[in-house]
Protein backbone atom coordinates (compact mmCIF):
# COMPACT_ATOMS: atom_id res chain seq x y z
CA UNK A 1 0.00 0.00 0.00
CA UNK A 2 1.44 3.33 -1.06
CA UNK A 3 0.50 6.12 1.36
CA UNK A 4 2.06 9.05 -0.47
CA UNK A 5 -0.80 11.24 -1.83
CA UNK A 6 0.27 11.10 -5.49
CA UNK A 7 -3.18 11.69 -6.96
CA UNK A 8 -4.04 14.62 -4.69
CA UNK A 9 -0.79 16.34 -5.71
CA UNK A 10 -1.46 15.60 -9.40
CA UNK A 11 -5.02 17.00 -9.17
CA UNK A 12 -4.30 20.08 -7.03
CA UNK A 13 -0.90 21.14 -8.44
CA UNK A 14 -2.04 22.76 -11.76
CA UNK A 15 -4.76 24.97 -10.26
CA UNK A 16 -2.61 25.90 -7.24
CA UNK A 17 0.44 26.76 -9.38
CA UNK A 18 -1.86 28.46 -11.90
CA UNK A 19 -3.24 30.80 -9.23
CA UNK A 20 0.31 32.12 -8.70
CA UNK A 21 0.27 33.41 -12.32
CA UNK A 22 -1.54 36.54 -11.09
CA UNK A 23 1.59 37.52 -9.12
CA UNK A 24 3.62 37.62 -12.35
CA UNK A 25 4.01 40.96 -14.19
CA UNK A 26 0.96 41.98 -16.22
CA UNK A 27 2.88 42.58 -19.45
CA UNK A 28 5.37 39.72 -19.10
CA UNK A 29 3.82 37.47 -21.74
CA UNK A 30 7.04 35.53 -22.27
CA UNK A 31 7.37 34.83 -18.52
CA UNK A 32 3.71 33.72 -18.29
CA UNK A 33 4.07 31.37 -21.27
CA UNK A 34 7.21 29.71 -19.95
CA UNK A 35 5.78 29.46 -16.44
CA UNK A 36 2.62 27.73 -17.72
CA UNK A 37 4.47 25.35 -20.03
CA UNK A 38 6.86 24.41 -17.18
CA UNK A 39 3.90 23.66 -14.88
CA UNK A 40 2.33 21.43 -17.55
CA UNK A 41 5.59 19.56 -18.27
CA UNK A 42 6.27 19.09 -14.55
CA UNK A 43 2.72 17.81 -14.02
CA UNK A 44 3.04 15.39 -16.96
CA UNK A 45 6.39 14.08 -15.66
CA UNK A 46 4.95 13.70 -12.15
CA UNK A 47 1.93 11.79 -13.50
CA UNK A 48 4.11 9.53 -15.66
CA UNK A 49 6.47 8.80 -12.74
CA UNK A 50 3.59 7.97 -10.37
CA UNK A 51 1.97 5.64 -12.90
CA UNK A 52 5.21 3.93 -13.98
CA UNK A 53 6.40 3.12 -10.47
CA UNK A 54 3.18 2.77 -8.45
CA UNK A 55 0.61 1.35 -10.89
CA UNK A 56 0.32 -2.37 -11.77
CA UNK A 57 -1.39 -2.67 -15.16
CA UNK A 58 -2.36 -6.34 -14.58
CA UNK A 59 -4.36 -5.48 -11.44
CA UNK A 60 -8.00 -4.59 -12.28
CA UNK A 61 -8.65 -3.15 -8.81
CA UNK A 62 -8.48 0.53 -7.87
CA UNK A 63 -4.91 1.64 -7.13
CA UNK A 64 -3.24 4.70 -5.56
CA UNK A 65 -6.37 4.98 -3.39
CA UNK A 66 -6.76 8.10 -1.23
CA UNK A 67 -9.67 8.71 1.11
CA UNK A 68 -9.77 11.83 3.30
CA UNK A 69 -12.78 13.12 5.20
CA UNK A 70 -13.55 16.53 3.71
CA UNK A 71 -16.87 17.92 5.00
CA UNK A 72 -17.87 16.17 8.23
CA UNK A 73 -21.47 17.44 8.21
CA UNK A 74 -22.31 15.72 4.89
CA UNK A 75 -19.93 12.79 5.46
CA UNK A 76 -18.30 13.96 2.22
CA UNK A 77 -14.92 12.40 1.39
CA UNK A 78 -12.09 13.35 -0.96
CA UNK A 79 -11.77 9.93 -2.62
CA UNK A 80 -9.33 9.39 -5.46
CA UNK A 81 -8.08 6.26 -7.18
CA UNK A 82 -7.18 5.03 -10.65
CA UNK A 83 -7.59 1.82 -12.61
CA UNK A 84 -7.00 0.72 -16.20
CA UNK A 85 -10.01 2.70 -17.38
CA UNK A 86 -8.81 6.09 -16.13
CA UNK A 87 -5.05 5.91 -16.70
CA UNK A 88 -5.33 6.38 -20.50
CA UNK A 89 -7.54 9.52 -20.36
CA UNK A 90 -5.35 11.03 -17.59
CA UNK A 91 -2.17 10.65 -19.65
CA UNK A 92 -4.02 11.94 -22.74
CA UNK A 93 -5.14 14.99 -20.70
CA UNK A 94 -1.58 15.75 -19.61
CA UNK A 95 -0.18 15.38 -23.13
CA UNK A 96 -2.85 17.42 -24.95
CA UNK A 97 -2.98 20.19 -22.30
CA UNK A 98 0.81 20.61 -22.45
CA UNK A 99 0.66 20.95 -26.24
CA UNK A 100 -2.40 23.25 -26.05
CA UNK A 101 -0.48 25.66 -23.79
CA UNK A 102 2.30 25.63 -26.38
CA UNK A 103 -0.29 26.30 -29.11
CA UNK A 104 -1.62 29.27 -27.11
CA UNK A 105 1.65 31.25 -27.37
CA UNK A 106 0.20 33.81 -29.83
CA UNK A 107 -2.43 34.81 -27.21
CA UNK A 108 -1.29 38.11 -25.69
CA UNK A 109 -4.54 39.71 -24.46
CA UNK A 110 -5.16 38.97 -20.75
CA UNK A 111 -2.67 36.14 -21.03
CA UNK A 112 -2.47 35.61 -17.24
CA UNK A 113 -6.19 34.82 -17.01
CA UNK A 114 -6.08 32.73 -20.21
CA UNK A 115 -3.30 30.46 -18.92
CA UNK A 116 -4.86 30.22 -15.46
CA UNK A 117 -8.14 29.00 -17.00
CA UNK A 118 -6.27 26.35 -19.00
CA UNK A 119 -4.57 25.10 -15.83
CA UNK A 120 -7.89 25.13 -13.94
CA UNK A 121 -9.35 22.94 -16.70
CA UNK A 122 -6.33 20.64 -16.35
CA UNK A 123 -7.05 20.09 -12.64
CA UNK A 124 -10.76 19.53 -13.26
CA UNK A 125 -10.16 16.97 -15.98
CA UNK A 126 -7.63 14.91 -14.01
CA UNK A 127 -9.86 15.19 -10.91
CA UNK A 128 -12.81 13.83 -12.89
CA UNK A 129 -10.89 10.86 -14.31
CA UNK A 130 -9.46 9.91 -10.91
CA UNK A 131 -12.45 10.58 -8.61
CA UNK A 132 -13.93 7.62 -6.71
CA UNK A 133 -16.78 9.58 -5.14
CA UNK A 134 -19.99 10.53 -6.96
CA UNK A 135 -20.23 14.04 -5.51
CA UNK A 136 -16.54 14.70 -6.19
CA UNK A 137 -17.14 13.46 -9.76
CA UNK A 138 -19.96 16.01 -10.10
CA UNK A 139 -17.84 18.86 -8.65
CA UNK A 140 -15.00 18.11 -11.09
CA UNK A 141 -17.54 17.88 -13.93
CA UNK A 142 -18.79 21.37 -13.04
CA UNK A 143 -15.27 22.78 -12.59
CA UNK A 144 -14.88 22.45 -16.37
CA UNK A 145 -17.80 24.69 -17.30
CA UNK A 146 -16.62 28.11 -16.08
CA UNK A 147 -13.10 28.01 -17.63
CA UNK A 148 -14.48 26.85 -21.00
CA UNK A 149 -17.22 29.49 -20.91
CA UNK A 150 -14.70 32.27 -20.20
CA UNK A 151 -12.19 30.98 -22.77
CA UNK A 152 -15.00 31.02 -25.34
CA UNK A 153 -16.58 34.34 -24.37
CA UNK A 154 -13.31 36.30 -24.06
CA UNK A 155 -11.02 34.84 -26.73
CA UNK A 156 -13.49 33.55 -29.33
CA UNK A 157 -14.53 34.81 -32.76
CA UNK A 158 -17.25 37.27 -33.80
CA UNK A 159 -20.16 35.16 -32.49
CA UNK A 160 -18.32 34.15 -29.32
CA UNK A 161 -21.00 35.29 -26.84
CA UNK A 162 -23.72 33.38 -28.69
CA UNK A 163 -21.68 30.16 -28.82
CA UNK A 164 -20.51 30.55 -25.18
CA UNK A 165 -24.12 31.02 -24.00
CA UNK A 166 -25.26 28.03 -26.04
CA UNK A 167 -22.43 25.93 -24.57
CA UNK A 168 -23.26 26.87 -20.97
CA UNK A 169 -27.02 26.30 -21.45
CA UNK A 170 -26.52 22.83 -22.92
CA UNK A 171 -23.87 21.64 -20.47
CA UNK A 172 -25.46 23.21 -17.37
CA UNK A 173 -28.79 21.66 -18.42
CA UNK A 174 -27.08 18.27 -18.65
CA UNK A 175 -25.43 18.84 -15.26
CA UNK A 176 -28.86 19.18 -13.60
CA UNK A 177 -29.65 15.60 -14.66
CA UNK A 178 -26.21 14.47 -13.46
CA UNK A 179 -26.80 16.02 -10.02
CA UNK A 180 -30.25 14.41 -9.78
CA UNK A 181 -28.73 11.04 -10.67
CA UNK A 182 -25.90 11.43 -8.13
CA UNK A 183 -28.32 12.39 -5.33
CA UNK A 184 -30.72 9.57 -6.29
CA UNK A 185 -27.97 6.93 -6.17
CA UNK A 186 -26.55 8.40 -2.93
CA UNK A 187 -29.86 8.51 -1.04
CA UNK A 188 -31.29 5.17 -2.16
CA UNK A 189 -31.80 2.40 0.37
CA UNK A 190 -29.86 3.69 3.38
CA UNK A 191 -30.12 6.24 6.15
CA UNK A 192 -26.61 7.51 5.44
CA UNK A 193 -25.90 8.92 1.95
CA UNK A 194 -23.48 6.61 0.10
CA UNK A 195 -21.38 8.48 -2.44
CA UNK A 196 -18.57 5.93 -2.61
CA UNK A 197 -18.15 4.33 -6.05
CA UNK A 198 -17.25 0.93 -4.57
CA UNK A 199 -20.44 0.83 -2.45
CA UNK A 200 -22.59 1.98 -5.38
CA UNK A 201 -21.14 -0.67 -7.74
CA UNK A 202 -22.30 -3.45 -5.39
CA UNK A 203 -25.73 -1.86 -4.85
CA UNK A 204 -28.70 -3.35 -6.71
CA UNK A 205 -31.78 -1.26 -7.58
CA UNK A 206 -35.35 -2.04 -8.68
CA UNK A 207 -35.41 -2.17 -12.50
CA UNK A 208 -37.65 0.90 -12.95
CA UNK A 209 -35.51 3.00 -10.58
CA UNK A 210 -32.31 1.86 -12.28
CA UNK A 211 -33.75 2.88 -15.67
CA UNK A 212 -34.65 6.35 -14.28
CA UNK A 213 -31.11 6.77 -12.90
CA UNK A 214 -29.67 5.55 -16.21
CA UNK A 215 -31.67 8.06 -18.27
CA UNK A 216 -30.60 10.93 -15.96
CA UNK A 217 -26.90 10.08 -16.23
CA UNK A 218 -27.22 9.34 -19.95
CA UNK A 219 -28.65 12.81 -20.77
CA UNK A 220 -25.74 14.49 -18.92
CA UNK A 221 -23.13 12.40 -20.73
CA UNK A 222 -24.94 12.61 -24.09
CA UNK A 223 -24.64 16.42 -24.03
CA UNK A 224 -20.90 16.28 -23.33
CA UNK A 225 -20.03 13.41 -25.70
CA UNK A 226 -22.03 14.67 -27.74
CA UNK A 227 -24.73 12.24 -28.88
CA UNK A 228 -27.34 13.37 -31.41
CA UNK A 229 -29.69 15.26 -31.09
CA UNK A 230 -27.85 17.01 -28.19
CA UNK A 231 -24.82 17.88 -30.32
CA UNK A 232 -25.73 21.29 -31.79
CA UNK A 233 -23.61 23.27 -29.29
CA UNK A 234 -20.42 21.61 -30.55
CA UNK A 235 -20.07 23.05 -34.11
CA UNK A 236 -20.87 26.59 -32.86
CA UNK A 237 -18.41 26.27 -29.99
CA UNK A 238 -15.61 24.92 -32.19
CA UNK A 239 -16.36 27.46 -34.90
CA UNK A 240 -15.78 30.39 -32.52
CA UNK A 241 -13.21 29.16 -29.96
CA UNK A 242 -9.47 29.86 -30.16
CA UNK A 243 -7.72 26.81 -31.58
CA UNK A 244 -5.88 26.03 -28.31
CA UNK A 245 -9.31 25.85 -26.61
CA UNK A 246 -10.55 23.67 -29.49
CA UNK A 247 -7.67 21.27 -28.82
CA UNK A 248 -8.83 20.87 -25.21
CA UNK A 249 -12.48 20.54 -26.25
CA UNK A 250 -11.90 17.92 -28.97
CA UNK A 251 -9.04 16.15 -27.22
CA UNK A 252 -10.37 15.86 -23.67
CA UNK A 253 -13.76 17.48 -22.99
CA UNK A 254 -15.74 15.22 -25.36
CA UNK A 255 -13.98 12.18 -23.89
CA UNK A 256 -15.34 13.03 -20.43
CA UNK A 257 -18.85 12.15 -21.65
CA UNK A 258 -17.73 8.79 -23.05
CA UNK A 259 -15.77 8.08 -19.85
CA UNK A 260 -18.88 8.87 -17.76
CA UNK A 261 -20.96 6.46 -19.86
CA UNK A 262 -18.51 3.63 -19.13
CA UNK A 263 -17.71 4.54 -15.53
CA UNK A 264 -21.25 5.24 -14.28
CA UNK A 265 -23.83 3.93 -16.78
CA UNK A 266 -22.03 0.64 -17.47
CA UNK A 267 -20.33 -0.02 -14.15
CA UNK A 268 -22.99 1.22 -11.70
CA UNK A 269 -26.16 0.42 -13.69
CA UNK A 270 -25.47 -2.76 -15.71
CA UNK A 271 -29.09 -4.00 -15.92
CA UNK A 272 -30.36 -0.74 -17.38
CA UNK A 273 -27.38 -0.61 -19.75
CA UNK A 274 -28.17 -4.07 -21.13
CA UNK A 275 -31.79 -2.91 -21.72
CA UNK A 276 -30.72 0.31 -23.47
CA UNK A 277 -27.69 -1.03 -25.37
CA UNK A 278 -29.65 -1.97 -28.57
CA UNK A 279 -31.04 1.58 -28.71
CA UNK A 280 -27.57 3.02 -28.11
CA UNK A 281 -26.27 0.86 -30.96
CA UNK A 282 -28.92 2.31 -33.30
CA UNK A 283 -28.18 5.90 -32.14
CA UNK A 284 -24.44 5.37 -32.68
CA UNK A 285 -25.00 4.02 -36.19
CA UNK A 286 -27.31 6.92 -37.13
CA UNK A 287 -24.79 9.35 -35.63
CA UNK A 288 -21.94 8.08 -37.85
CA UNK A 289 -24.02 8.51 -41.03
CA UNK A 290 -25.74 11.76 -40.01
CA UNK A 291 -22.60 13.59 -38.83
CA UNK A 292 -20.55 12.41 -41.83
CA UNK A 293 -23.28 13.61 -44.23
CA UNK A 294 -23.69 16.93 -42.40
CA UNK A 295 -19.92 17.47 -42.33
CA UNK A 296 -19.89 17.36 -46.13
CA UNK A 297 -22.25 20.33 -46.32
CA UNK A 298 -20.22 22.59 -44.00
CA UNK A 299 -18.44 25.57 -45.58
CA UNK A 300 -16.68 26.51 -42.33
CA UNK A 301 -13.47 24.47 -41.89
CA UNK A 302 -13.66 24.19 -38.08
CA UNK A 303 -17.35 23.24 -38.20
CA UNK A 304 -16.53 20.48 -40.70
CA UNK A 305 -13.91 19.08 -38.32
CA UNK A 306 -16.41 19.41 -35.42
CA UNK A 307 -18.97 17.28 -37.27
CA UNK A 308 -16.25 14.73 -38.02
CA UNK A 309 -15.71 14.52 -34.23
CA UNK A 310 -19.43 13.81 -33.75
CA UNK A 311 -19.19 11.06 -36.38
CA UNK A 312 -16.17 9.46 -34.69
CA UNK A 313 -17.97 9.52 -31.33
CA UNK A 314 -20.53 7.20 -32.97
CA UNK A 315 -17.91 4.41 -32.99
CA UNK A 316 -17.31 4.92 -29.26
CA UNK A 317 -21.07 4.65 -28.55
CA UNK A 318 -21.33 1.46 -30.64
CA UNK A 319 -18.31 -0.04 -28.84
CA UNK A 320 -19.85 0.77 -25.44
CA UNK A 321 -23.21 -0.74 -26.43
CA UNK A 322 -21.75 -3.92 -27.98
CA UNK A 323 -21.39 -5.51 -24.48
CA UNK A 324 -18.23 -7.37 -25.57
CA UNK A 325 -14.71 -6.91 -24.24
CA UNK A 326 -13.49 -6.45 -27.84
CA UNK A 327 -16.03 -3.68 -28.53
CA UNK A 328 -15.36 -1.87 -25.24
CA UNK A 329 -11.59 -2.06 -25.75
CA UNK A 330 -12.13 -0.62 -29.25
CA UNK A 331 -14.19 2.24 -27.77
CA UNK A 332 -11.44 3.02 -25.23
CA UNK A 333 -8.82 2.97 -28.00
CA UNK A 334 -11.00 5.28 -30.12
CA UNK A 335 -11.27 7.69 -27.15
CA UNK A 336 -7.46 7.98 -27.04
CA UNK A 337 -7.02 7.92 -30.82
CA UNK A 338 -9.56 10.64 -31.57
CA UNK A 339 -8.18 12.72 -28.69
CA UNK A 340 -4.91 13.03 -30.62
CA UNK A 341 -6.35 13.35 -34.15
CA UNK A 342 -9.12 15.84 -33.28
CA UNK A 343 -6.73 18.09 -31.33
CA UNK A 344 -4.21 18.07 -34.20
CA UNK A 345 -6.80 18.92 -36.88
CA UNK A 346 -8.13 21.88 -34.88
CA UNK A 347 -4.60 23.12 -34.22
CA UNK A 348 -3.71 23.00 -37.93
CA UNK A 349 -7.03 24.62 -38.92
CA UNK A 350 -6.35 27.44 -36.43
CA UNK A 351 -2.77 28.06 -37.54
CA UNK A 352 -3.93 28.12 -41.18
CA UNK A 353 -6.54 30.74 -40.24
CA UNK A 354 -3.83 32.83 -38.55
CA UNK A 355 -2.06 33.06 -41.90
CA UNK A 356 -4.82 33.48 -44.50
CA UNK A 357 -7.63 34.90 -42.31
CA UNK A 358 -10.27 32.82 -44.11
CA UNK A 359 -12.69 30.35 -42.51
CA UNK A 360 -14.76 29.19 -45.49
CA UNK A 361 -13.40 26.34 -47.57
CA UNK A 362 -14.78 27.66 -50.87
CA UNK A 363 -12.74 30.86 -50.40
CA UNK A 364 -9.46 28.98 -49.86
CA UNK A 365 -7.25 27.27 -52.40
CA UNK A 366 -3.76 26.97 -53.82
CA UNK A 367 -1.80 27.31 -50.58
CA UNK A 368 0.10 24.00 -50.81
CA UNK A 369 3.06 25.54 -52.68
CA UNK A 370 3.77 28.44 -50.26
CA UNK A 371 3.00 26.24 -47.21
CA UNK A 372 4.32 22.70 -47.92
CA UNK A 373 4.91 21.71 -44.26
CA UNK A 374 1.39 22.74 -43.29
CA UNK A 375 0.04 20.83 -46.29
CA UNK A 376 1.96 17.67 -45.35
CA UNK A 377 0.81 17.69 -41.73
CA UNK A 378 -2.83 18.52 -42.52
CA UNK A 379 -2.98 15.78 -45.18
CA UNK A 380 -1.40 13.26 -42.77
CA UNK A 381 -3.94 13.97 -40.03
CA UNK A 382 -6.80 13.90 -42.56
CA UNK A 383 -5.60 10.40 -43.48
CA UNK A 384 -5.49 9.48 -39.79
CA UNK A 385 -9.06 10.80 -39.40
CA UNK A 386 -10.34 8.56 -42.20
CA UNK A 387 -8.74 5.54 -40.43
CA UNK A 388 -5.84 4.81 -42.78
CA UNK A 389 -4.18 1.43 -41.96
CA UNK A 390 -1.09 1.96 -39.82
CA UNK A 391 -2.70 4.79 -37.86
CA UNK A 392 -4.56 4.64 -34.55
CA UNK A 393 -8.06 5.31 -35.95
CA UNK A 394 -7.92 2.23 -38.18
CA UNK A 395 -7.14 -0.15 -35.31
CA UNK A 396 -9.83 1.39 -33.07
CA UNK A 397 -12.59 1.18 -35.69
CA UNK A 398 -11.55 -2.34 -36.70
CA UNK A 399 -11.72 -3.57 -33.08
CA UNK A 400 -15.18 -1.97 -32.68
CA UNK A 401 -16.29 -3.86 -35.84
CA UNK A 402 -15.01 -7.14 -34.39
CA UNK A 403 -16.77 -6.32 -31.12
CA UNK A 404 -20.15 -6.10 -32.86
CA UNK A 405 -19.63 -9.22 -34.99
CA UNK A 406 -18.50 -11.37 -32.05
CA UNK A 407 -21.20 -10.08 -29.66
CA UNK A 408 -23.53 -12.73 -28.17
CA UNK A 409 -26.33 -10.32 -27.24
CA UNK A 410 -27.51 -9.51 -30.77
CA UNK A 411 -28.98 -11.72 -33.49
CA UNK A 412 -27.12 -12.20 -36.77
CA UNK A 413 -29.36 -10.02 -38.97
CA UNK A 414 -29.23 -6.87 -36.73
CA UNK A 415 -25.44 -7.31 -36.46
CA UNK A 416 -25.06 -7.53 -40.24
CA UNK A 417 -27.36 -4.54 -40.76
CA UNK A 418 -25.46 -2.35 -38.26
CA UNK A 419 -22.11 -3.44 -39.73
CA UNK A 420 -23.36 -2.58 -43.23
CA UNK A 421 -24.57 0.90 -42.17
CA UNK A 422 -21.27 1.54 -40.32
CA UNK A 423 -19.42 0.57 -43.50
CA UNK A 424 -21.39 3.25 -45.38
CA UNK A 425 -20.23 5.75 -42.73
CA UNK A 426 -16.63 4.64 -43.28
CA UNK A 427 -17.09 5.27 -47.03
CA UNK A 428 -18.45 8.79 -46.32
CA UNK A 429 -15.51 9.62 -44.01
CA UNK A 430 -12.84 9.87 -46.79
CA UNK A 431 -15.16 12.12 -48.81
CA UNK A 432 -15.25 14.88 -46.18
CA UNK A 433 -11.73 14.17 -44.84
CA UNK A 434 -10.04 14.41 -48.24
CA UNK A 435 -12.19 17.26 -49.56
CA UNK A 436 -10.80 19.50 -46.76
CA UNK A 437 -7.15 19.43 -47.90
CA UNK A 438 -8.29 19.44 -51.55
CA UNK A 439 -10.27 22.67 -51.14
CA UNK A 440 -7.65 24.30 -48.92
CA UNK A 441 -4.39 23.41 -50.61
CA UNK A 442 -5.14 22.60 -54.25
CA UNK A 443 -6.86 24.63 -56.96
CA UNK A 444 -6.29 28.24 -57.97
CA UNK A 445 -4.26 30.68 -55.93
CA UNK A 446 -6.04 33.28 -53.86
CA UNK A 447 -5.67 36.76 -55.26
CA UNK A 448 -7.47 38.53 -52.44
CA UNK A 449 -5.10 37.35 -49.69
CA UNK A 450 -1.95 39.32 -48.86
CA UNK A 451 1.14 37.48 -50.10
CA UNK A 452 3.36 38.36 -47.15
CA UNK A 453 1.16 36.35 -44.75
CA UNK A 454 1.91 33.13 -46.64
CA UNK A 455 4.69 31.78 -44.45
CA UNK A 456 5.01 28.11 -43.58
CA UNK A 457 4.96 26.34 -40.20
CA UNK A 458 7.60 27.50 -37.75
CA UNK A 459 9.61 25.24 -35.39
CA UNK A 460 6.98 25.50 -32.60
CA UNK A 461 4.12 24.41 -34.88
CA UNK A 462 6.17 21.64 -36.48
CA UNK A 463 7.22 20.31 -33.07
CA UNK A 464 3.59 20.36 -31.91
CA UNK A 465 2.26 18.56 -35.01
CA UNK A 466 4.98 15.89 -34.94
CA UNK A 467 4.48 15.37 -31.17
CA UNK A 468 0.83 14.45 -31.83
CA UNK A 469 1.60 12.49 -35.00
CA UNK A 470 4.07 10.12 -33.31
CA UNK A 471 1.50 8.63 -30.85
CA UNK A 472 -1.03 8.30 -33.71
CA UNK A 473 1.48 6.20 -35.69
CA UNK A 474 2.75 4.42 -32.55
CA UNK A 475 -0.74 3.30 -31.45
CA UNK A 476 -1.56 2.32 -35.05
CA UNK A 477 1.48 0.03 -35.24
CA UNK A 478 1.38 -1.24 -31.64
CA UNK A 479 -2.13 -0.75 -30.16
CA UNK A 480 -1.38 -3.12 -27.28
CA UNK A 481 0.44 -0.22 -25.61
CA UNK A 482 -3.00 1.31 -24.85
CA UNK A 483 -5.12 -1.86 -24.79
CA UNK A 484 -2.95 -3.59 -22.16
CA UNK A 485 -3.78 -0.86 -19.62
CA UNK A 486 -7.53 -1.48 -19.60
CA UNK A 487 -8.03 -5.09 -20.72
CA UNK A 488 -8.38 -6.55 -17.18
CA UNK A 489 -10.69 -3.76 -16.02
CA UNK A 490 -12.90 -4.25 -19.10
CA UNK A 491 -13.34 -7.93 -18.21
CA UNK A 492 -14.38 -6.98 -14.66
CA UNK A 493 -16.95 -4.43 -15.94
CA UNK A 494 -18.46 -6.90 -18.41
CA UNK A 495 -18.61 -9.70 -15.82
CA UNK A 496 -21.37 -7.64 -14.11
CA UNK A 497 -23.61 -8.18 -17.14
CA UNK A 498 -23.36 -11.96 -16.93
CA UNK A 499 -23.07 -12.73 -13.22
CA UNK A 500 -25.25 -10.14 -11.52
From Swiss-Prot:
UniProt key word Chloroplast: yes
Keywords: Chloroplast, Membrane, NAD, NADP, Plastid, Plastoquinone, Quinone, Thylakoid, Translocase, Transmembrane, Transmembrane helix
Catalytic EC class: translocase
Location of the protein in the cell: Plastid, Chloroplast thylakoid membrane
GO molecular function, one term: ubiquinone binding
NAD recorded as keyword: yes
Transmembrane segments: 4-24, 35-55, 87-107, 113-130, 134-154, 167-187, 208-228, 242-262, 272-292, 305-325, 330-350, 386-406, 416-436, 462-482
GO cellular component: chloroplast thylakoid membrane
Catalysed conversion reaction: a plastoquinone + NADH + (n+1) H(+)(in) = a plastoquinol + NAD(+) + n H(+)(out); a plastoquinone + NADPH + (n+1) H(+)(in) = a plastoquinol + NADP(+) + n H(+)(out)
Mode of membrane association: Multi-pass membrane protein
InterPro entries the UniProt entry points to: NADH_Q_OxRdtase_chain4, NADH_Q_OxRdtase_chainM/4, NADH_UbQ_OxRdtase, ND/Mrp_TM
Principal subcellular localization: plastid
Family in the record: Belongs to the complex I subunit 4 family.
Name of the protein described by the UniProt record: NAD(P)H-quinone oxidoreductase chain 4, chloroplastic
Amino acid sequence: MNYFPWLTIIVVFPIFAGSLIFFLPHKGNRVIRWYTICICILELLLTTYAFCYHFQSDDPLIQLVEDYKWIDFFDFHWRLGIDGLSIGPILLTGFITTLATLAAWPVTRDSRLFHFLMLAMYSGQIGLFSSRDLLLFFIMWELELIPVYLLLAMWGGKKRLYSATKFILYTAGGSVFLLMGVLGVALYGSNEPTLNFETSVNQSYPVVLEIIFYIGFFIAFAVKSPIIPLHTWLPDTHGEAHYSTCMLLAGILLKMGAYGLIRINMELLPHAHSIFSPWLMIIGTIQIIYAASTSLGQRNLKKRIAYSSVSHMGFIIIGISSLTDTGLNGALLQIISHGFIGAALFFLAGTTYDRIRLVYLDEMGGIAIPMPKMFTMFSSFSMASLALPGMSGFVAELIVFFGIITGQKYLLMPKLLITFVMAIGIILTPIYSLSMPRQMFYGYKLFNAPKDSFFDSGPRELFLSISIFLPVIGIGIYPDFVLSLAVDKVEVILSNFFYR
